[in-house]
């Protein structure tokens, strides 16, 4: 038999004993043994515990209700706190707006004060101008009466404004007349100045023409001189060309004579005068050396016939063709 079964059996015995005690009177209960009395006390304690448990449950239910109420109040407080925060933010914004409005109002007051001072100064200036105009009106009142008399006396004008408009038209026309007169004087002075400049330029051009004419005469004179020089140069060149042709013909004759005697080479061209003269010079030097040698040995050797050289008479004639 385990403990659970023992406990259940003991509980059943206790219940049976309690039922018997309820059926027995109180005098008999006092005579009951100690275990029964203990069981009775235990039952009383259980009843007290159950009563306290019920009180505890009731108290917990009340606490739960109070807790719900507290949560509702907390939610209400939170909502109120949010509203309070929003109201604080709104109040801050309103305060800032009020500060800005106050600053604007102060600046507007300052501007209005400045405008008021400016208007006061303008009023003072207008008062001064009014006093001046009043003095001028009093001053020119005689003129007004005089103009009225003039209008009455004249048949052309019907009122003072008409007379004044005519007067202003004439006054405005006078500067135009002065300007036109000034323009005409300026144009006249410009024309005179232009004529003077033209006359000066004409004199300068005439002087320049005279100077150029003198230069032209000098150039013509120089041209004639250079023409004379050119003619002289042509004559001199012609004469020198003739002399050069004569010299060339003489050189050619001498060269032909030297070639005919076999003293030079025939490979030189007919127009190469320089080579021909060089060959003639060499031949003359050779003949001179030979002649000197022969003159030294004249007594020992037979007379040698020297080659015939061209005479002065044949120098100026060209060779026979």
Swiss-Prot record:
Transmembrane segments: none annotated. Residues 36-144, 202-229 form a coiled coil. Keywords: Coiled coil. GO terms for cellular component: cytoskeleton. Belongs to the CFAP73 family. This is Coiled-coil domain-containing protein 42-like 1. It comes from Xenopus laevis.
């Amino acid at each position: 038999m385990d403990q659970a079964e023992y406990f259940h059996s003991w509980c059943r015995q206790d219940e049976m004993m309690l039922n018997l005690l309820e059926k027995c009177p109180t005098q008999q209960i006092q005579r009951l043994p100690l275990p029964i009395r203990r069981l009775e006390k235990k039952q009383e304690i259980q009843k007290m515990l159950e009563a306290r448990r019920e009180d505890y449950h009731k108290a917990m239910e009340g606490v739960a209700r109070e807790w719900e109420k507290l949560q509702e109040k907390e939610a209400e407080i939170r909502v109120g706190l949010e509203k309070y925060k929003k109201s604080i933010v709104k109040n801050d914004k309103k305060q800032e707006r009020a500060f800005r409005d106050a600053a604007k109002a102060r600046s507007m007051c300052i501007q209005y004060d400045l405008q008021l001072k400016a208007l006061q100064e303008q009023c003072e200036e207008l008062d001064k101008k009014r006093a001046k105009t009043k003095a001028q009106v009093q001053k020119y009142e005689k003129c007004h009466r005089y103009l009225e008399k003039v209008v009455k006396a004249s048949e052309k004008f019907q009122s003072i404004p008409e007379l004044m408009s005519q007067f202003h038209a004439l006054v405005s026309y006078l500067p135009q007349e002065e300007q036109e007169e000034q323009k005409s004087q300026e144009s006249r002075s410009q024309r005179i100045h232009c004529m003077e400049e033209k006359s000066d330029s004409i004199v300068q051009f005439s002087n320049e023409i005279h100077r150029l004419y003198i230069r032209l005469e000098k150039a013509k004179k120089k041209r004639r001189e250079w023409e004379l020089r050119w003619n002289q140069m042509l004559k001199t060149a012609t004469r020198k060309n003739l002399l050069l042709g004569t010299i060339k013909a003489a050189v050619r004759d001498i060269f032909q004579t030297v070639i005919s005697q076999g003293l030079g080479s025939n490979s030189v061209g007919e127009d190469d005068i320089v080579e021909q003269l060089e060959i003639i010079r060499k031949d003359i030097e050779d003949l001179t050396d030979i002649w000197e040698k022969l003159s030294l040995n004249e007594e020992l050797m037979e007379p040698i016939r020297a080659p015939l050289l061209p005479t002065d008479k044949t120098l100026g004639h060209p060779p026979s063709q």
